[in-house]
Structure formats: C-alpha cells, structure tokens
Amino acid sequence: MQYSFTEKKRIRKSFAKRPIVHQVPFLLATQLESFSTFLQAEVPTAQRKPEGLQAAFTSVFPIVSHNGFARLEFVSYMLSPPAFNIKECQQRGLTYCSALRAKVRLVLLDKESPSKPVVKEVKEQEVYMGEIPLMTPTGSFVINGTERVIVSQLHRSPGVFFEHDKGKTHSSGKLLFSARIIPYRGSWLDFEFDPKDVLYFRVDRRRKMPVTILLKAIGLTPEQILANFFVFDNFTLMPEGAQMEFVPERLRGEVARFDITDRDGKVIVQKDKRINAKHIRDLENAKTKYISVPEDYLLGRVLAKNVVDGDTGEVIANANDEVTESVLDKLREAKIKDIQTLYTNDLDQGPYISSTLRIDETADKMAARIAIYRMMRPGEPPTEEAVEALFNRLFYSEEAYDLSKVGRMKFNRRVGRDEIVGPMTLQDDDILATIKILVELRNGKGEVDDIDHLGNRRVRCVGELAENQFRAGLVRVERAVKERLGQAESENLMPHDLINSKPISSAIREFFGSSQLSQFMDQTNPLSEITHKRRVSALGPGGLTRERAGFEVRDVHPTHYGRVCPIETPEGPNIGLINSLALYAHLNEYGFLETPYRKVTDGKVTDQIDYLSAIEEGRYVIAQANAAVAEDGTLTDELVSSREAGETLMVTPDRIQYMDVAPSQIVSVAASLIPFLEHDDANRALMGSNMQRQAVPCLRPEKPVVGTGIERTVAVDSGTTVQALRGGVVDYVDAGRIVIRVNDDEAVAGDVGVDIYNLIKYTRSNQNTNINQRPIAKVGDKVARGDVLADGASTDLGELALGQNMLVAFMPWNGYNFEDSILISEKVVADDRYTSIHIEELNVVARDTKLGPEEITRDISNLAEVQLGRLDESGIVYIGAEVEAGDVLVGKVTPKGETQLTPEEKLLRAIFGEKASDVKDTSLRVPSGMSGTVIDVQVFTREGIQRDKRAQQIIDDELKRYRLDLNDQLRIVEGDAFQRLARMLEGKVANGGPKKLAKGTKIERAYLEDLDHYHWFDIRLADEEAAAQLEAIKDSIEQKRHQFDLAFEEKRKKLTQGDELPPGVLKMVKVYLAVKRRLQPGDKMAGRHGNKGVVSKIVPIEDMPYMADGRPADVVLNPLGVPSRMNVGQVLEVHLGWAAKGLGWRIGEMLQRQARIEEVRAFLTKIYNESGRAEELESFSDDEILELAKNLREGVPFATPVFDGATEEEMSSMLDLAFPDDIAQNLGMTKSKNQVRLYDGRTGEAFERTVTVGYMHYLKLHHLVDDKMHARSTGPYSLVTQQPLGGKAQFGGQRFGEMEVWALEAYGASYVLQEMLTVKSDDVTGRTKVYENLVKGDHVIDAGMPESFNVLVKEIRSLGIDIDLDRN
C-alpha cells in the first residue's frame, strides 16, 4: 500500500474487516462534471456535444424572419478568460464570471426569386451574449463577492405515469385510474376515469373533455377508435335467430341464456347454467365453429362498424349504436347478413371507450380540434388556421414541446417498446399507447407506478438548471430578433445590431442571484461546505412545495439504498424534502442516481464494478456488503441476506447476481463520519449528522482519536487543505507561502518548474468563522502529487478535525448536568481547547449626497483625541488595534442641511467667511456587544477620485507580495539554469572570457564559482554547439525575466485601476475584526451521536472528579442522556477513545525513556496488525517509525468504519494492550477495564461506584451565547404601532405577550402592568414625560394613551364605522 507524505506521519488504525474494493469517488464530482458539461469550455468548437450552452443555442437558432427572407444562424461560441481571479472577486464584491461571445451568421435571401431561394448576402460576426458565472474548483460560485452553491433538484422525471386516487375521490371508495404525460417542457396531458367509468383528458389541468375528442382530433374515425380498443364478435343473421362465431375464452364464466348445442343439436350447456372449463372443452372437442343464438341475444349489443346498404349507399346504423329490434328489421330489409359487435364483459373488458364515445358530441376531426381550441382559448373566435396552429403547437412543435431524451426513454420503456430513442415531440401512437395501458389498468391488468421510486425521480444539476435559464433568456432574445430581422436588409444591419444580450444576462443573473436553488454557501466548516454541495432538494421551481408535500414523498424509499442517505435530512418542515447524496452515488447520462455494485457470477464475487440505477437494480438479486467472502471471492454462507425488487430475503449464493461495494454505501458523508453509527438510534444519528455541520473550527484543530477512516477524504475533497499540484521538493516555507521545486519528469517544457502556494490567512467565511491555512511541509521534504502541504480550518494533518478529544466521565455532579447540561473543567478554557476566532466584516460607504460628498477623514469635530487615537491620517483604523463596542473604526462626516440663518448671522458669515454648512459625524463604530482586533482593512475608491495614503499603501503591500512570488520563481528558474550551465561549461575549452581567461584554457569549477553567474555568458567557447547552447540558456532566462515583468505590470494595472462601486458611492472601506470567543456557560456543545447539551458551569480544575493518578476529567456528562435516547455509540466511542489515549501514553513513555527502535516497532506492529486491516510498517525506515511514534503520543487514532466497526473483543484487546494489569490497578480500573474509580475533587473521597471514563470527540456548535445575549434600554420603535422592535438584529426589546399580562394581573401588580403597557411600550408622550421627570429628579409616571389604541381606532374607521373618544 502506498502511503502519502501526510499519511506516513500518523496512520489511522482501521478495524475494517473488508478490503477496500472501490475508492470513494471525488465528493464534488456531480457539481463539477455537470457544470463543465454545460460550458464545454475545454472542448474544441467542432467537437462540442449537443448539451449545455451548445444545446441551448442550437435549439433556438436559426431564427427566421416573418417573411422568410432573412435568417440568423449560430456558428459557435467562445468564453473569454475572467477579468479577475476568485480572491479578487471576493474582495471587490464582484461576480467571478466569463464573457460569452457567439459567432452568428446573418443570411439574406433574394426576394426576387421566391420559388427557389438564392442567397444574396452573408454577414458573420461575433456578438457579446452576456456573462456566465464560472464555478470555482471547489464547486461553488462567487456572486457579488459571496460564495453561493446551486443545490441539485430532485424532480419528477419526464415520461408517462399511471396512478390511481387510492379511492379518495369518490365516496364509494372506487379506484379512479389516471395517466399523465409529463414533458421536459410543454403542455402536460392528463387522462382520467370518472366514477361512471368514462375516460376524459385534460391539457395543462384545464377543463376535462371526453378522450374521444382527442382521438378524433388526431384523425381517427369512431370505427378506428373502436377497432383500436376492442375485439369483435361476429354474427350472421338467419331467418330465425343468428349464428355467432365461437371463441372459447369469451364464454367462460358467463351464464347461458339459452341451451347451447353442438352441430348435431346435442345440448352441451343447459339454459341458466354457468359455463365452465369442461363445457368449453366439450364444445372444442365437438369442433364447434358457430353457436346458434336467439335474436334477443343480439339486442343491447353495440355495433363495431357503420352498417351501409350495399345498393343505396345509405347508412343504416352507425358504429357504437346499440342493436335494437328496429335496427335488426332494417338489416333484414337491406338483406345484410354479417354484422360485428363489440365484445365486452364486466370482468376484464369494460365498455369504457364506447361509453365515452357516446357522450362525445363532435362529428369529425375539425370539430374535435375546435372543441380543444375553445377549451384552451375561451372567448376567441376559432378560425381554421388558428385552430390548426394551436393544436400542432400543443404536442407536435419542437419549439413548444420537448419530451427530452430522458422522457422518450422513460415513455418507451413504460409502454413496452424496445427502442429507447425516438422523436422528442408527442406522436399519435404515443397517445394511443397511453390510453390503451390506462384502459388495461382499469380492466385489472398491470400495476400503477410508484412516483417516489428513484427510477421515476431524476436529479437536475447545476449545468442543467443553468442551461434552462439560458434557454429562457435566448427565447426572449429570439422574439426581439424576429421583429428586427425584417428590417435587416433595408437598414443594412449587422448581427450585433439585431441581438440585445440584456435578457440573457438578466435571466442568468436572476438564477444565480435569487433562485430558490441558489443558496448562500454554508461555510461553518469543511464538512458543511461539502454537504451543501452534495445536497439534493425536492423544493424549488418545478418541484414540490413544503405545504403540499405529503408523507410518502418525504419517507425513505427502498430505492434510496446507496443513492440518497436515509439518515441525513433536516428536522422540521423540510424533513425528507432535502436529502444528501450517498457516499458512492453517481448520476448517469439521464440524471438518474446510480450506485456501484460488484458483479457476482456463479456464487463468486468478481472485481468488476457496475453502476446500477434504481430501475436496473430491481431486476437483480443483490447481496449486502457484510456477506462472508472467502479469499478467492466465493460466498461462503449457506443463505445470504440480500435484496430483490425492494424486498429483503435470504437466498442461496448461486442466486446472487451483485454485491454491495462497501458497508458505508448507504449513508452520506456526514453520517459516515459517525463512529459506531450502527449502535445509534436513527433519530439521534440524524441529529449527529446535522450538528457536525455546525461545529465551529477550533483554534488548534485536533483529529478525532476515534474516527471512521473517511476523515482524510472529506478534508482533501472539500478543498480546505492545500494539495500539491505536482510532485517535487519543498524549497521554502513560511506561515503564508510554500514554494516547491517541481520534479523534472513532471515539469512541462517551457514551464517555470516552480509551484508557489499562497496560503489563506485569517479570512472570513460566509458564517463569520475563520479560514486559516497552516503549512505541514518542511523545507527539503519530498512530496508527490496530491499530498497535503497545508492544513486548513478544522483539519489536522490532512484529516477532518471538527472538535477536540475530551476526557469524559459519565456521572451526575450536583445537578449541574441535569437535562443534558454539560459540566466543563476550567482547564479546557485555560488551554484554549474550544477557543475559536470569528471574523466580522464592517463596511462604511462614502456617498455623493445632494448637499455634497461625504468625506472619510480623521478631522471630526466634537470627538476627543482618545477616540481618534487608533485612526491614521486618512481616518482609518490601524491594523492590530484592539477595539471595543463604540470605538471609531473609520471617521466619516456627512454634510448637514443648512439651517435658516437670521439676517445678522448672514452678515457675520459674509464678513468672516465662516463654513457655509455644518457636517455631522457618521463614523463607522464597533457595534454593541462586539470587541476584537483589527486584522485587515480594504479601501475601494471610485475611478477618477484621488486615492488617500492608506489606499495607496495597501496597493503597494499587495504589489510587494506579488513581486516576492515572482522573485522566488525567478530565483529557482535561474538556479536550475545555472546548475545546468555549470555542468555544461566544466571541462570545455574557452576562446577567452572575463578575468583574462586565456584562449585554449579548460574551464574549471573554481573559476566559475569565482565569477558572478551573469558573467558566465561572456565566456567565449571553442565548441560551436556548446556556444549555441550557452546563448539558448541566456535567451531563455532573459525571456522569463521579460515574462515576469509583464505579469507584474499586468498586476499593477489591475490594482491601480478604479474599483467598480455601486452608483453614487465614492469610496468604500471594509474593516475586518477578529473576535476571540472562549467557551462559556450558555454555549451549545455536542458529540457526534446527537448527544447535545448546553454548558452549565465551568468548574475550577481542583473541584473536578479525578482519577487515582490525579488526572481530572475534562467534561462530566449525565449518564441518563444515554438509555432513553438509544445512542449507545457514544459509550463505545468513549471506551475505544480511552484505549487509543492509553496506547498513546505507552508510546510516549517509551520515547521518554529512549527505548530501542526495535521495541517501538514491535509495539506499533502489535497495535496495527493484530486485528482489523493490516498496515505495512516494515516499509518504514527507522526515522519514519520515530516520527510516527512522536505523532502518536497524544493517542493512536482508530478508524471504526460505519457498519464494519470494531467488535467488543477488539476493543477489549486494545484496552488490555493500553492498560496492562499493573497500570490498570494503579488507576483503580475495574477487572474488565471499562470503568475507573473516581475521587471527588472537593472532598478527596472516592465516589461510591466506579465510573465510565474515556475520550470522546466533542464539538462546540455555532450557537454561541455571545451571539444570542442581548439587552436594550431604549432603541428603535415600529413606525405604525410605536412599539419597540423585536430581535437582536433590530436591537429590539423583549416581547411581553398576552400570557405575561395575565401573570402580572394574577399578582395584582397594577403599576408594573401599567408601565409595561404604556411608557415601556407605545405611549409616545408618556415616554418623553418619564425622561423629563427623571431629569428633574422626580420619579413619577404619567401614563397617557397607548399608540396601539389610536391604531385600533383608525382601523375601525377604515371599516366605515365612525368611532371617536368621548373627551369629557
């Protein structure tokens, strides 16, 4: 097994029993692949597939003018590189996007020859089509400077669906069947039965009409309609009665209404007897072809065809007419002998279409189409052209109707056709096939569809959603272009005159900026980022709404297995509507979720891996991942637990066709991070998955000692760590950058061969948490491609580290851990274990007002020098200043309106020339309840406005940093070049050179070292080839220098140009404050098993319960939090964590007494290779073993993968290894080593019973008491009611509601109640009165009229009731 540079530093011991057969795929693949398919930016123009932008363009173009003599054709499109990189866009509040240009061709035809079109003129031109936001490498978008995520949508797949109403519509409980044809875009077509068994259709949920109107509209006659849906009985009329053609299966089960005889007249079935199988056999044996029936047997039957008099051509009876005695008389008169009637029965051949045809009053195709037109466009007069146009547009026009590739595939599969491709519009036989299946369902044949089956729901990803928006914009453009195309020739227009890109830009901007599926990225920690991008929502445009979604849609479905996580979903109104993709899930070309399985042939598991969608999976028998497999892949159990078509069953190995790839296949990323998930109740696991996403990154991240082995994948895939793009040697490292000299075999020709990684330092995330990267690599380290070079927020040595490992004791402690409260040791706070840094961004804007421009300045009147002490000469706070609530960060003054001056004042002003207008102080101050350190300031200045000194300094610093990078690259490039040069020059014969080098002298190393490197180029070599090489190297260095100078100039230009600011804004300053949040009572904390609580008390370290060796517990939890909640995983985690730490202590003790390396190696081998997955420690050098041991001193990290974790025996053996009997005895551990004797820190006495103690990975959640604490004395009031606003954000008051009023009434506290309802709330005059009284030193309340009473009076008046106060 290959260990990466970081994995070698600290190996996680895995207890997995099963080998890794399939690596977890890249976790952001769905987002990145979908968007790259949409753009196809890397694909050459000629090879672009018809998907994404290409599909949108080709579906709308060519646009033809109304007269047909001009058309605009699409040739190709190209995307220009973005003007600013991602970081610049975030700083400047811009959108990271690329300009889209399309090459279009305007073709003008000659109007003189309308019969044969002749091209008169062709104009080709590139046209700007708006901006397309680009996806960052981590799958998000930067829109107006903030990172956003486009969530994938789970919607109903296009195609045809059959369902029934479950008997809810009609009081009798009868099942009413219906069918619905859903296109990707276009009109929906519904078919439905009513309680009387008549079949109707409706278009776009409008008024229903008999389905035969639709069938006539597509060109069928009543005869053809009946022929399509019924089989016929043939009768021959005789002078007495008639003869019926004998079809055996049509008679079975019927009651004979007359004696049925064979040809010889022998009675086979007597009258009033039910015809059974024996009777039919007898009739078949008697070779009966016809049965004689009495005439009344024909009465009431329905004619299948029109009956026409052969001589006169007169229609005697129409198809679908009932046979009556008068009809029979007419037939006999016209000497017509053969007639056909419809065969129907009550069991499986209902007369539904026939009875529908009977209520249909339309006569022919045109009448049917007019009826449909009237339903779609009521009130408009139906002309023939309009009727035809509307009907064709409904289902047959490619512009208005698109079934899509998926829809066609699903449709054909459902109606039982073999081919899965076909036209994208609806065909006549599609409508017929749908109605036939619906009638068969009503007849009791076949099954209805399950709409929650993942074969009937598909995922729309970013690319597809963006394509739909782009197409919508293009369609708007098309309308405008059509109008103008007519004038194209007369006005000599070019393509860019025809196309206005605004509709496209606005459609795209609206989608990325304000669509329900475009969400502000959850960036609390790397896991929340990755989960947000893997989320699948059933809400959004074209999806469900919370209110209408029933229980079935939200429920877990058997097809979710391996595709959608059954655990991770929000609590509350969105439960089950927002899901997360399972770990291995993957989208196929149609947008259906697939999951991988291992192929099994003849009871033997192969290495072949197939991805199956929910539809395909139903056809196979699939074994679970925990089935026992021998070395050669044979399934060893007699019966294997497996799934088939959604059912779980035990089958023999020979029936198995596939097998799961991994036990963690069914859960999502967040759920697969919970160790011992299999021992937790599902509801608690749900909370655990959701709360991990809210964990705040700690100051010093610490890897979980008990993990699941997927931590590294999550950390790396989330993009928070820095990965090496190419292998090489680390050349330089500091806190902010890493420079790598790339391996020769990975360097591309003409490339610099240097990779520089600038780390992200103390940057604000969307949730105000801190993003900071710390280098792991040291100078001289050899790294390979993909190795982790630097840790990000919440990662430790390339592994996800959301919390801290705490020594936990499960015991009650003086009621301080009642109801999930948490008791914490002061040591945890003192060591800054849970201290986190939060970064607040504060903005101030200087605008151009009517009274003149606002000014950012240090010169503010009425402010003491103390308050201005932290500002520089530009009026902006220094970096590093520690500020508290109310401190000035940026000084700003705003012009104030002129007050009316008296003539005397005017005179004085005129004489002494005093300032004409006043200014008021509108400086940016630190908001209440906030304090911190200024860590960054950014100044943005509008184009054409003088930059202040501070802004100039910021630009100079940025340029200095950039020059440093370029110099490093140049240093390494030149170093490599001079090394090559030295090797080449050594031993060569010179014709002369600097320092009087004689002709014919051999060049020596000492001579070269004595010379300045640049003077080497002045050496004249005798060998011409070598001289040419010397020139080439000189040129390449010169070229690189020139390139770097150009890059520097480009950067300078970008920085010195004015910033794009909103209209009316002259200058904008952003100040970033770093706020340190220590753990304090009121903060919410949680483990990974849904065991959440609030810190109740921070106890001095000497009062905490401690062990025999004096080690105090960090956290004391209530044992009652475990049994009723059934999350036993936390107890197992604590035991295994205890073993992990114990092993670490033993390794630390070995290193301290400088044990021999063999002893350390042997101990490590014992830990890693006695059970679970073996590690190849023998491949490690002694130095590597030593470094590994040093990193394990704080605990040997364990991995217990979900559903494949550590067993009780393995945990016991690890505890035995960590705590040999002598150590266990000293610690006062029980015999089974699962509990410890604890002592009370306050009395020093031992507690009565032993206590479960161990290490748990505990998280601090983003629900901090600092953000929730809030107090107000006075503040803003609501405009209408004049009552204080509510909530911390509005600086509001506390609500005093109806029930609180009752409480004060019950106490009889009348004065308190009066002031609550008046002066403390909405009595405006009373409020000012109280203030006046207080100033006078008189503490009296004069309560007046509450404003809400006036509002009530006004509201009653608005109802037209004159109400007034009686003011006697």
From Swiss-Prot:
GO BP annotations, alphabetical order: DNA-templated transcription
Presence of the UniProt keyword Acetylation in the record: no
Residue stretches spanning the membrane: none
Molecular function in Gene Ontology: DNA binding; DNA-directed RNA polymerase activity; ribonucleoside binding
Domain of life of the source: Bacteria
Pfam families: RNA_pol_Rpb2_1, RNA_pol_Rpb2_2, RNA_pol_Rpb2_3, RNA_pol_Rpb2_45, RNA_pol_Rpb2_6, RNA_pol_Rpb2_7
Keyword terms: DNA-directed RNA polymerase, Nucleotidyltransferase, Transcription, Transferase
Reactions this protein catalyses: RNA(n) + a ribonucleoside 5'-triphosphate = RNA(n+1) + diphosphate
PROSITE patterns tied to this protein: RNA_POL_BETA (PS01166)
Cellular component GO terms held in the UniProt record: DNA-directed RNA polymerase complex
EC number: 2.7.7.6
Alphabetized HAMAP family for the sequence: RNApol_bact_RpoB
Family: Belongs to the RNA polymerase beta chain family.
PANTHER family the UniProt entry points to: DNA-DIRECTED RNA POLYMERASE I SUBUNIT 2
Role according to the record: DNA-dependent RNA polymerase catalyzes the transcription of DNA into RNA using the four ribonucleoside triphosphates as substrates.
Subunit structure: The RNAP catalytic core consists of 2 alpha, 1 beta, 1 beta' and 1 omega subunit. When a sigma factor is associated with the core the holoenzyme is formed, which can initiate transcription.
Protein name: DNA-directed RNA polymerase subunit beta
Top-level taxonomy: Bacteria, Pseudomonadati, Pseudomonadota, Betaproteobacteria, Burkholderiales
